[in-house]
Each structure stands twice: as structure tokens, then as C-alpha cells.
Amino acid sequence: MSPFSIVLIGFAMSTDAFAAAIGKGAAMRKPQWRDALRAGLIFGCIEAITPVIGWLLGRAASSYVSAYDHWIAFVLLGALGTHMIVAGLRNGPEEAEDAASDTPKRHGVLGLATTGFATSIDAMAVGVSLAFLDVHIGVVAVVVGLCTFSMVTAGVMLGRALGNLIGKRAEMLGGLILVIVGSVILYEHLSGAA
């Protein structure tokens, strides 16, 4: 897998966390940099670990499905991407109410970690699909973690001003990127096999 594809996956995986960070930032009256950095660190660490867990699970099953690995990666990335696009198109009234609230909130480590884990489930599934490709999972984990750290830190700081508008678009963009990466993986395999 090319370095460019790995970076694309890193940013695609961080868009859910970015959308959540915008909501977190919107819930705070005036988020400080330390709040944003703390959220970025928590989300980034969780988002870096989950694809490794998925990769380990995928590696355990890889000998059984190696003839179909490119299709598995395509279907998983395509399904996750489509899900993210559909979720981005939906109008989430609960998220809108949370973002519109003027009540300042502090977000504790447990609350941030719970949200971070919830937004990283897709990264675990991507990790499963990466087990079937020629990729160094350590590099992917670091890239995903750094992308998530950056996106969440920026998301918290942008949250108050921008609200859910950017968050939904970021999720749709991330989904589109996953669909494209999955399609490229399938195309590269099929064109190389032909």
C-alpha cells in the first residue's frame, strides 16, 4: 500500500472523531488549547490501537481467505465508507441539540475515552481489511493516531464556531475516501492479476 493511501486512510478514519470533537467543542463555552490537546491525545491513542486489534484478528483468519482478500478489503472499506456517507446525510436531532446548547460542559477522561472508542470501531474494521494487504500495521497505527490527534484537536477548537455543519460534511468526506481506497485496492489487484 502506498504512503499516500495510508495517509488517506488515516484522515478518513479520523473524520468520525473530528465530527465528535466539533460536538464536544460546541458544548464548551470557550474551549482552551489544553482541552483540545487532551481530547486529541485520548482519541488519537484509541484510534491508533483499534486498527492493530483488527489487524491481529484479520491475520488470524488470513490463511483461510487469502484468495479473496482483495474482495474482503473492498467490501469492508466500501461498506464502512457507505455507512459514513449515509450517517453524514442523516439529520441527527440529538447532536444538533447538544451542539446548540449554551451550557458549558467539561469533558472528563472517561467520557472522552468512551466517545473515542465509539468513533474508532470503524478503524478496527479497517484493521481487519489491512491484514489481507501488504502493509506495515505499525506505520498505519502511527499515521491514524497522528491524524486523529490533529483532527480532534482542531475539531474541539473549531466546534464552538462551526457546530455540526462541518462535522457532517467531514463524515461524508471520510466515507467517500474509504470507498475510493477500497475501489483502488480492488482495481490494483484485478489489474495485476489480469
Curated annotation (Swiss-Prot):
The entry's keywords: Cell inner membrane, Cell membrane, Ion transport, Manganese, Membrane, Transmembrane, Transmembrane helix, Transport
Function, as annotated: Probably functions as a manganese efflux pump.
Stretches that traverse the bilayer: 3-23, 37-57, 69-89, 110-132, 147-167, 172-192
Main location per the UniProt record: membrane
GO CC, any one term: plasma membrane
The protein's name in its UniProt record: Putative manganese efflux pump MntP
An annotated Gene Ontology molecular function: manganese ion transmembrane transporter activity
Topology in the lipid bilayer: Multi-pass membrane protein
